Regions:
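Conserved catalytic core of sirtuin-type NAD+-dependent deacylases
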Residues: 1-187
């Protein structure tokens, strides 16, 4: 086995149909109706407007969830890899030991202080999609998202140790061992 470490970013997934990081339709260039991506993808937005935050991430997940890994993902499937991509395509390609240094849209954690390392769980996107499969109503979608992520639809306040948060490193967060930063530093 080679001692080569591969580090990848958004360009790797472009051939699978995922826009590049800041391209014309990129993940970080398309915001919500009222907020920029840099405002949406923050812990502060998750706390202040969890319904908007979750709707924004959900719409990205639904758009990308059925895409397939491309030849680069497959080539990297047995390599030592750190990826900045949150799309999960490296996992779908068969790489079970890569480090998703920015997290993964397929996973969630319980909402904790940033220093706390918690177990990862499967994201409840399927549950949300099943409940809203025939509806284009964003208000219904917000309600279902809040319920699936254990956030009160009355208070709209995520609760520490109870609510779920997408396993994604946000702009106003820092690397911790939740994102396997210590392990990445030793590669």
């Amino acid at each position: 086995m080679s001692n080569t470490l591969y580090i990848t970013g958004a360009g790797v997934s472009a051939d699978s149909g995922i826009p590049t990081f800041r391209g014309e339709d990129g993940f970080w260039t398309v915001g919500s109706k009222n907020y920029t991506p840099q405002q949406m993808a923050t812990r502060q937005m998750y706390i202040a407007k969890p319904d908007e935050f979750l709707l924004w991430y959900y719409k990205r997940f639904v758009k990308y969830r059925n895409l397939k890994p491309n030849s680069v993902h497959k080539w990297l499937s047995n390599k030592t890899l750190i990826t900045q991509n949150i799309d999960g395509l490296d996992y779908k390609a068969g790489n079970k030991s890569f480090i998703p240094i920015h997290g993964s849209l397929n996973k969630v954690t319980t909402f904790e202080t940033q220093e706390c390392v918690t177990d990862l769980q499967e994201a409840p996107w399927d549950k949300v999609q099943a409940a809203c499969k025939t509806s284009e109503d964003d208000n219904l979608l917000r309600k279902v998202l809040l319920e699936a992520f254990n956030i009160s639809t009355q208070t709209l306040t995520p609760r520490i140790h109870e609510s779920l948060k997408p396993f994604v490193l946000l702009f106003d967060e820092y690397y911790t061992d939740l994102y396997r930063i210590s392990e990445a530093g030793k590669m």
